[in-house]
From Swiss-Prot:
<dbReference type="InterPro" id="IPR024560">
    <property type="entry name" value="UPF0313_C"/>
</dbReference>
<protein>
    <recommendedName>
        <fullName>UPF0313 protein RPA0679</fullName>
    </recommendedName>
</protein>
<dbReference type="InterPro" id="IPR020612">
    <property type="entry name" value="Methylthiotransferase_CS"/>
</dbReference>
<dbReference type="GO" id="GO:0051539">
    <property type="term" value="F:4 iron, 4 sulfur cluster binding"/>
</dbReference>
<keyword id="KW-0408">Iron</keyword>
<dbReference type="Pfam" id="PF11842">
    <property type="entry name" value="DUF3362"/>
</dbReference>
<feature type="region of interest" description="Disordered">
    <location>
        <begin position="635"/>
        <end position="677"/>
    </location>
</feature>
<keyword id="KW-0479">Metal-binding</keyword>
<dbReference type="InterPro" id="IPR006638">
    <property type="entry name" value="Elp3/MiaA/NifB-like_rSAM"/>
</dbReference>
<dbReference type="InterPro" id="IPR023404">
    <property type="entry name" value="rSAM_horseshoe"/>
</dbReference>
<comment type="similarity">
    <text>Belongs to the UPF0313 family.</text>
</comment>
<feature type="domain" description="Radical SAM core">
    <location>
        <begin position="335"/>
        <end position="601"/>
    </location>
</feature>
<feature type="binding site">
    <location>
        <position position="356"/>
    </location>
    <ligand>
        <name>[4Fe-4S] cluster</name>
    </ligand>
</feature>
<dbReference type="InterPro" id="IPR022946">
    <property type="entry name" value="UPF0313"/>
</dbReference>
<keyword id="KW-0004">4Fe-4S</keyword>
<feature type="binding site">
    <location>
        <position position="353"/>
    </location>
    <ligand>
        <name>[4Fe-4S] cluster</name>
    </ligand>
</feature>
<keyword id="KW-0411">Iron-sulfur</keyword>
Amino acid sequence: MQTSTEVVPPLMSRFRPSAAPRKPAPFLPMSRAEMDKLGWDACDIVLVTGDAYVDHPSFGMAIIGRLLESQGFRVGIISQPDWQSAEPFKALGKPRVFFGVTGGNMDSMVNRYTADRRLRHDDAYTPNGEGGKRPDRCTLVYAQRCREAFKDVPIILGGIEASLRRIAHYDYWSDKVRRSVLADAKADLLLYGNAERAVIEVAHRLAAGEAPRELEDIRGVALFRRVPENTIELHADDLDAADEGARQVRGDVVIRLPSCEQVEQDKEAYARASRVLHRESNPGNARPLVQRHGDRDLWLNPPPIPLTTEEMDSVYDLPYARAPHPSYGNAKIPAWDMIKTSVTIMRGCFGGCTFCSITEHEGRIIQSRSEASILQEIEKIRDKTPGFTGVISDIGGPTANMYRMACKDSNIESSCRKPSCVFPDICPNLNTSHDDLIRLYRKVREVKGIKRVMVASGVRYDLAVKSPAYIKELVSHHVGGYLKIAPEHTERGPLDKMMKPGIGTYHRFKQMFEAAAKQAGKQYYLIPYFIAAHPGTTDEDMMNLALWLKRNRYRADQVQTFLPSPMATATAMYHSGVNPLRGVRHGASEPVEAIKGLRQRRLHKAFLRYHDPDNWPVLREALKAMGRADLIGSRPDQLVPAHQPPGTGKAAGTRRPVRGDGPKPQRFTTKGVRLVK
């Protein structure tokens, strides 16, 4: 997608003029010794990451590193450096062009802390899963150390941590609004979203001698700059006015968000900034945004143009070693073990779930690979993965079943400002055909040496019910005992705040799934995921969800509690107490109940684990306070018994469920579990 006047060169159309073609490095170097073997006296670009270096397209630094290598640059990697001093950041010498800094595949605070702000003791992106190998606010710390190491080298931020902190944002862990990470890190540029186009442009122009401040015309770039003369400023306050559409102006337009200082003090202003940012997320019609930080203006260019299928193929066909760097020896990297036999077939998500960061980072436009590229990668997995058993562990992406889905009309797509293509109902302009995906599944199964192809990515069931043929194909060939899906709740109030379909859609999918399983002679189970303590959820909502779980004989072994990640719409609800999905105006905004106290958050978690005796005391207390003591007792329609087993009830959630009389549950290590009837 692009605007009618914008010319977007193909992703791989450039090559560094001064660079002679060279053979790709077996691995991007992590030491001077490796650089010496390659005959390098210096790196052009040094990438610093909070993850272990795995040379595989599921790891962002590998993609960016190999992409820049393909452009003729010498690229080195500094992985999980000791941040206590600048010395480890000098390990590869002074880069000629820039430092690229990322926290890794996850926001470092999400990686290091639970939803209850408790420190995690493991890290899936670290050798042997060891925790503590990256600092809090990893991107910020690494950037500051890079500046100490070499003051005059440009620093470019990227990755999901930088993307979701590109403007003033609420930080759950410090419980305050923080400045853009670009300001705190004192970096030169921030590239947000999937940044292949931007990083190529930035690298070539910096190498040609331009200064970072001159790169103000690149999509997906955030930087500090002055608003150019003759630019028309529209204030975010006016964008929800009844006549906003009639008052739209032509020419160079920028939208001025409430300032950093204003959103720190005014929660409604924060919600308004969030609303406008999400409205301006379509690459086809997004306008630049500007937000004052002290005496400077933070400028956000419109989002990057999505990659074409050919460009997606070129990214995933780069010469990855498809293994961790040899310096890790025999150490196990849990994230690598999880994905080494999986295949990404697409990017993006048009679901728009308010608690999710995928749309903010990857966008709503689905970017799909070709069948040929996907099949080629599967053959590489078969031929190059030690101990490969013939099972592809997952074929999907952010969701399992949006492959090649798109708006039926490119003009409508480029002008749309809706945050979701499927809420409150599936848009009539959306092509929901699963035919391409079904055909892909069948071709993958035909690859020699492939025994099973699993679908482990979350299935978007509101789309799946539109294609009985897809459900049949899925159940017949790609489910291994259970299938995880995410209704998230049963009650309309929280579901509307999440922008999720009603529970009736789940029931339709369940009926179709069970019918297909019966026809295929299989005994499969659905594993539903639910969220506790999401904004807009009342205690009564959680009680009704618990009753639904009991009626349907589900037990949750693990509980997912809402975690306010930076820049998500639900986080704006949590912080501001108003709904940015609606018009935000002082005194007229729709209020949203936010579950903030630890006591209430634990109560909501306890409702999801109603069957755990350790939770019964707090549930009895809550039910009495709610006037629902009638739900205390041993009848099937009651939620918790009146008696308390000895030795239980001391600390909610610290013990495994006690199995009572009746049918024994079928247990999985998942967030939801179906009981066998």
